[in-house]
Design a protein with these regions (language model features):
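ER/secretory pathway lumenal C-terminal domains and tails of membrane proteins involved
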Residues: 2-3, 100-108, 125, 141-150, ...
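Extracytoplasmic catalytic/substrate-binding loops of multi-pass membrane glycan-assembly enzymes
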Residues: 31-43, 53-64, 78, 244-249, ...
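Juxtamembrane segments of multi-pass membrane glycosylation machinery
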Residues: 50-56, 64-86, 91, 99, ...
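Loop-to-helix entry region of an early transmembrane alpha helix in multi-pass inner-membrane enzymes
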Residues: 59, 71-93, 97, 116, ...
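Canonical tetratricopeptide repeat
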Residues: 79, 631, 664-665, 699, ...
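Register position in tetratricopeptide repeats
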Residues: 640, 674, 708, 742, ...
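Canonical positions in the second alpha-helix
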Residues: 654, 687-688, 721-722, 755-756
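Terminal, low-structured helical/coil segments at or just beyond the last alpha-helical repeat
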Residues: 742-780
């Protein structure tokens, strides 16, 4: 090794370490303290108990994450999050190393300080662009499979590039065996990791096609692949022990195969598009364009143009490695657009599917920056111009850190944790609760398995209830449910169409049987997030975040005592509410839950504030509206019983816990109006109408407020405003005509109906009404 090469190796290691420390520090200062919504709760819970998560099971992730749960941290969720943080930072490190190798193959080993400065700074910019990209940053601070998968992908790619440099050296083919093993074993992290394989094959063909004629190498590669895939034996081994979370029950060959192939999900097809091509590509472009500047940013195009320019330079300077990087980028972006075939109504943003592709775009940013820096080095002002240019490039890269920091800071975010805790705490001892999907199921599993809280409650996920293995587990694994079907009958359950033509799903059959067999023995609940209550609505009574099922039709739709107790004395709101300055350290406790008297009740909203320090994405905001909805339900109850002070308290609490919730507007107008605060009701209504001039319910609610206050002029005025704003809406005309009739102003009523008929001459019922009114005007 020459002195120049030794110097390069030493400084390259120092720069790489700096990149790793920078990325790791970024992630460590924004890492989630506990679980996040979506799959995180499930992955942490199954890693902790060595269970089986949703197909395809991610066995390698479970094993490695379980080791992280053994770290001496009290919060096990943080320990598993740390796995993503470390692998996310390692991903940035290997993007740096890959970019350096590309630059060395093009520019040669750096010959002096300025050459090293250009190379290492440009490669660091590429790595930090990857580290600060929105999707990868999100993956690196929560318990998900994508950061470990990205690390393995970049490590494999670095090995490929390294082999491409040394393929003529003795023993270099051993790297290919290692690559095959890593690709195979990493499928146990995420199936998408296998997408590096086509790029690997093409790159190997371009570099040295003769390796495919080496029988010994082929045999070793096949053996390495089989050995790597063997980590999937975890699934049947652990499943046979019946852990409390055992999705797909893959202990038998048929179930194991179905788990790997994800048979329980809707089959994918690339030929029947689930959304127009234009939508799917525009969705991808939106995700791509928001990576470094956030939604609505204007700088992204510059960074993306730099990457596109770098791709051209890379192609011109070193086509071998260009083929590898371009192949990876295309497989992880364009291929996925075609293969994943996303709908135009996905339940969440799917940017994380393309995160690896965005990462492999970043080396081209480094190539572009190095090329531009070289241009400055060839000028007579290079002594100062090159450092300035590199400083600008580094600052530009770091700008994405500051732009994305707010939306990626998970410190203090306990919303998912407390949501799961609160929902479980709602359920009476030994109860069961029907849930709907990921976000009302996985946090509950986490709280039960990791926190060891309320394991007496049986969580029944309605989506999984369509599968026979899940029904079997509900029947045979503690806490067991009484189910009338035999195991054979469970396997034979199929959807059918009833007499009315409605499709009855397996979950409908199973849920009805569970309710029929367990009512009276177990308290039964439905989470408020359940979309279809299967006709049991009249039997459901709200108790906070869940409805309790009553065998007979309920006389009240809300249990006032239990709901108040849960909302104010049981539920936790960390990351959502904070005590105001000088306020209490914890939520007040009830003494008389029906008439919550004393100082605690009158100024609650002023003693607690919305926690603006904790960022809440749209999904979190949507889920916490369930707290607001419960308070609004209480508000309506109090309005109906003329308890206006209590109604205002609940309204203010609803607005406090979910400021962006749209559902409170009409109720707010009613609450203040019925409480006699007409001016405030008017002010609110007109502010709402300024933003939503076509919101009919606001007009009508303010009309009712005026009528209740005997303000006939105000009532007439708001209805006139409604018919002027919405001349095609019949409600305003109908109510105004009725209002005039009640006042005995039949002529005015007739004029309103004529005005409607001028716009809608074919309305026969309006024509008949006009005839009746005209008779009254004539005194007939």
């Amino acid at each position: 090794m020459t002195e120049m090469e030794a110097s390069h190796r030493r400084w390259n290691m120092i720069a790489g370490a700096a990149v790793f420390v920078t990325a790791f520090s970024c992630y460590l200062t924004t890492i989630g303290s506990t679980l996040a919504f979506w799959d995180c709760g499930e992955f942490i819970a199954t890693a902790y108990i060595l269970g089986v998560p949703h197909p395809p099971g991610t066995p390698l992730y479970q094993l490695v994450a379980h080791l992280f749960t053994m770290l001496p941290f009290q919060e096990k969720a943080f320990s598993v999050n740390l796995m993503s943080t470390i692998t996310g930072a390692l991903t940035a490190l290997f993007i740096y190393l890959i970019t350096v190798k590309i630059l060395v193959q093009w520019r040669g080993t750096p010959k002096g300080p300025r050459d090293r400065m250009i190379m290492y700074s440009s490669a660091a910019c590429a790595a930090l662009a990857a580290a600060f990209s929105s999707s990868h940053w999100s993956d690196a601070i929560e318990a998900e499979v994508y950061a470990p998968s990205a690390f393995i992908m970049t490590f494999i790619t670095w090995l490929m590039v390294r082999w491409g440099e040394r393929y003529r050296e003795p023993g270099s083919r051993n790297s290919l065996v290692l690559i095959c093993f890593l690709i195979a074993i990493s499928v146990g992290l995420h199936l998408g990791t296998a997408l590096v394989f086509p790029a690997f094959i093409v790159f190997a063909l371009v570099v040295d096609w003769r390796i495919f004629t080496d029988a010994r190498l082929v045999v070793l590669a096949v053996f390495a692949i089989i050995l790597g895939l063997s980590n999937h034996l975890y699934l049947p081994i652990r499943s046979s022990l019946n852990p409390r979370i055992d999705e797909a029950d893959p202990q038998r060959w048929a179930a194991f195969k179905d788990c790997i192939l994800r048979k329980q999900y809707k089959p994918m097809t690339i030929f029947v598009r689930q959304a127009p091509w234009s939508f799917q590509f525009s969705m991808f472009w939106r995700y791509f364009s928001e990576q470094w500047t956030g939604a609505g940013g204007s700088w992204t195009i510059l960074l993306m143009l730099a990457g596109a320019f770098g791709a051209v330079i890379h192609y011109l300077k070193h086509r071998r490695t260009f083929i590898l990087i371009a192949g990876l980028f295309l497989m992880l972006t364009l291929f996925l657009i075609v293969y994943m075939n996303f709908t135009d109504h996905e339940v969440r943003d799917r940017d994380y599917f393309y995160a690896h592709g965005f990462i492999f775009f970043c080396p081209w940013i480094g190539v572009a920056f190095a090329y531009l820096a070289d241009l400055t080095a060839s000028t007579k002002w290079s002594r100062w111009l090159t450092p300035v240019a590199l400083a600008v490039m580094i600052a530009f890269t770091f700008s994405s850190y500051f732009v994305n920091f707010r939306t990626h800071d998970r410190r203090g975010d306990y919303n998912a944790h407390d949501y799961g805790y609160n929902m479980l705490a709602t359920v009476a001892p030994n109860g069961l609760i029907f849930t709907n999907g990921d976000n009302d199921t996985f946090p509950l599993w986490f709280i039960q398995e990791v926190k060891n809280f309320r394991k007496d409650v049986r969580v029944v996920n309605l989506s999984l209830l369509n599968t026979p293995w899940y029904i079997w587990q509900l029947k045979h694994i503690e806490p067991k449910l009484d189910i009338s079907f035999t195991d054979k009958e469970v396997n034979e359950l199929r959807p059918f169409r009833d007499r009315d033509g409605k499709i009855v799903m397996v979950k409908d059959i199973a849920a009805k049987d569970i309710i029929d067999r367990n009512q009276g023995n177990r308290p039964i609940y439905f989470a408020v997030t359940v979309a279809d209550y299967m006709g049991y609505d009249p039997h459901l009574v709200l108790e906070g975040l869940a409805f309790r099922y009553e065998p007979k039709e309920a006389s009240e739709s809300i249990d006032l005592t239990r709901t108040l107790y849960n909302l104010y004395s049981v539920y936790k709101y960390r990351g959502l509410l904070l005590p105001a300055a000088g306020g209490p350290a914890s939520a007040p406790q009830f003494t008389d839950v029906r008439k919550w008297g004393g100082a605690d009740s009158t100024d609650f909203a002023s003693r607690y504030v919305y926690d603006t320090k904790v960022y809440k994405d749209t999904n979190t905001q949507r889920l916490v509206t369930n707290y607001a909805a419960a308070h609004l339900k209480l508000c309506v109850y109090y309005l109906q019983n003329a308890e206006f002070d209590n109604a205002m308290r609940e309204l203010e609490r609803a607005i406090l816990v979910s400021p962006g919730f749209e559902g409170y507007k009409e109720i707010a107008v009613a609450t203040y109006g019925y409480a006699g605060q007409i001016a405030k009701a008017e002010s609110l209504a007109y502010s709402f109408l300024a933003a939503e001039p076509r919101n009919v319910n606001i007009y009508l609610q303010l009309f009712r407020v005026y009528r209740r206050a005997n303000n006939q002029q105000g009532a007439e005025g708001i209805l006139m405003r409604l018919i002027n704003a919405l001349p095609d809406n019949p409600d305003g005309f109908s109510m105004l005509a009725s209002f005039y009739e009640e006042q005995g102003a039949h002529a005015k009523a007739a004029d309103i109906v004529r005005r409607w008929l001028d716009l809608h001459p074919n309305d026969k019922s309006a024509a008949n009404l006009l005839q009746s009114l005209e008779k009254k005007v004539r005194g007939e």
